[in-house]
Amino acid sequence: MRIAIVGGGLAGSLAAAVLTRAGYRVALIDKRAVYPEEFRVEKLGGQQVDILRRLGLLDAFANEGCTFDTTLNIRRGKVVDISRTVNYGLHYAPMVAIARRLIADPSSLIVDQVLKITPSDDLQRLTLASGNQVVARLVILATGMAGAIPYSLGIKRRVIVERHSLALGFTIAPADGAEFAFSALTSYGEQAADGIDYLSIFPIRGGMRANLFMFRDPNDPIMREIRREPKSTLLRLIPGLRQHLGDFKVIDRVQSWVMDLANVEGHLQPGVVLIGDSFQTSCPAAGTGVSRLLVDVERLCTVHLPEWLTTGGMGTEKIAAFYSDRDKIASDEFAFRMAHFRQALTADAGVRWDLRRRLHFLRRNLRHRVDAIRPGWTGRLAGMLRA
C-alpha cells in the first residue's frame, strides 16, 4: 500500500526520495511536472549539510551547487569575523529538481491536483482533479503555506506574527567584469532604525547572489526604492559595503518574499501528518526553515513511519508520536526563538538590545582576533567550559 505525499516542493520531494530509496511505494502528487522558479531558500549549509549527508542525499546537491567554505562577515565596513563552513549556493527550483531526481521510482510522481482527502484510522482516500483516486496508508502534507487542503480537513493556520520579516534576492556582478575579492560575504545592518538584519552574498550559477533580510513593513516606501534602484538604495542603507564590493551592477530583477510566523492547530488527525512549512513557518533571516524541514523528513521517514507500518492502522496515537518527537519539538522551538532573537537583535532600539547588539559583535570580533593569533584556541576553551 502506498504512502501519499501531497505537495512536490522541497519537503515533499525529499520525503519521496528518502522513502523510495528505502523501498517504500510512494505517490508524490503535485500539479506541476517541473517546479517553477520561485524565490525561496538559495543556500544550504550547517545542519542542513549534516542531515543531507546522513540521508545519503548530499552528493547530488554538492555536485550541482556552487561550493564555498569561507565567508567574510562585516559590519559598518569593518571585519567582524570569518566563517569557515561548507555551503552550497543554488536556486530553489534546481534544489527541487535534484530532490525529484533522487526519487528511486520516477513513476512515483503523479502530475495532478488533490481536491479532497478522506482520512480514517485505516486507509486514506485522495480524490484528484483528473477524477482518479489514490488510496494510501498515510498522507504526508507538504503543501507549504498553501492552506486549501489542510483547511478542508479542519486544520487551521494560526498566525503568531503577521509580516514578520522580508527577504529580497537579486544577482550582482563587478562593473568591470572582474571578480569580487571574496568568495562570500555577509554584511550586517548598521543601525537599528533601518531594520536590516544582513545582506548575504554568495556564488550561484549565473553570478553572485545577494539575499537581503529585513524587518520592515512590506508597504514601506523603502521596498519600492530597493526594487527600482537596488544598487544606490543598498549603498545608502549599508554604506560600509562600498569598500568591499567596489563598483558593481545588479544584473536581474529584485525578487521579494514576505513571511508570517505561523503554525497550525487541529492537525492531530488519523492518517495525515504535516511536515515543513505546512506545520510551522520560519524566519528566513534565521536560516532555520530548511533545517526544520530536514529534521521533519529525517525523523518521520527514517524513525516513525517505518515503525508505524509494522502494524495495522494509522490512528492518532501513531501520528502523535511524530508531533511529540523530541528532536522535532527542539527544532520547531529553536526556529521560533531564533526568529524573535534576530528581529530584536536587528531592530529593537531600546537600551537593553542596543547593549546586547554591541556585545554580540564585540564577542565575535574578539574571538576572531584571538583565533588569528592562536588558531582554534577559543573553540578548545569553549569545549572545556561545556565539559
Give the positions of each predicted feature.
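Beta1/beta-strand and adjacent pyrophosphate-binding region of the FAD-binding site
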Residues: M1-A11
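Glycine-rich FAD pyrophosphate-binding loop
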Residues: V6, T20-R40
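Conserved Rossmann-like nucleotide-cofactor binding loop
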Residues: A11, V34, A146
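Conserved N-terminal glycine-rich FAD pyrophosphate-binding loop of Rossmann-like flavoproteins
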Residues: A33-R53
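Conserved N-terminal helical subregion
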Residues: D50, R54, F61-I155, V159-S165, ...
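Conserved FAD-binding catalytic core of PHBH/FMO-like flavoproteins
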Residues: A142-L241
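FAD/FMN-dependent oxidoreductases across multiple families
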Residues: P218-T310, M314-G315
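C-terminal helical "tail/cap" subdomain of flavin- and related membrane-associated enzymes
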Residues: D247, T302-A387
